[in-house]
Amino acid sequence: YHYLKTSNLSLVIPKIKNKYIVVSQKRVPINKINYEFPSGIVEKKETTLQSAYKELSEETGYKSRSKLSKIITFYTEPGRLTTKITGYYTKDLIKISKPEKGIKIHLFNQSDIFKLILKQKFNNSSHIAMFLYLIKNIKNL
């Protein structure tokens, strides 16, 4: 039986003025622009929370003024990978810089995100699962 030991991930679902911040960037493995939430690898000496703050700032140019709220942690593909993804949510944001080169930020409502998913432009299954969990289970969005 084969499986890969892979890094864990953090993801942030940020919301400002009743819109979710979504980033788009070219993803080499699929050779397409993909829409997704800010996310990244949790480095060896980081917690998932530290990684989430870093990814939010690097990918969007926004900083959360309050502690990020944890959504849930789950395995991304337990039959093949050891990767866990931990999601966080915030709606208390302040703009501090520009996003990283090659990343565009967008403000979408919930309906817009569902349309992107249906058009297969929002293609990361763990991001979709985290978003669905958030809107179904978290109060006061």
PLM region descriptions:
Residues Y1-H2, S24, S126:
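Short linear motifs in exposed loops
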Residues F37-S69, Y88, K98-E100, N109:
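The catalytic Nudix box helix
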Residues T76-I96, H106:
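Active-site-adjacent beta-strand/loop module that shapes the phosphate/pyrophosphate-binding cleft
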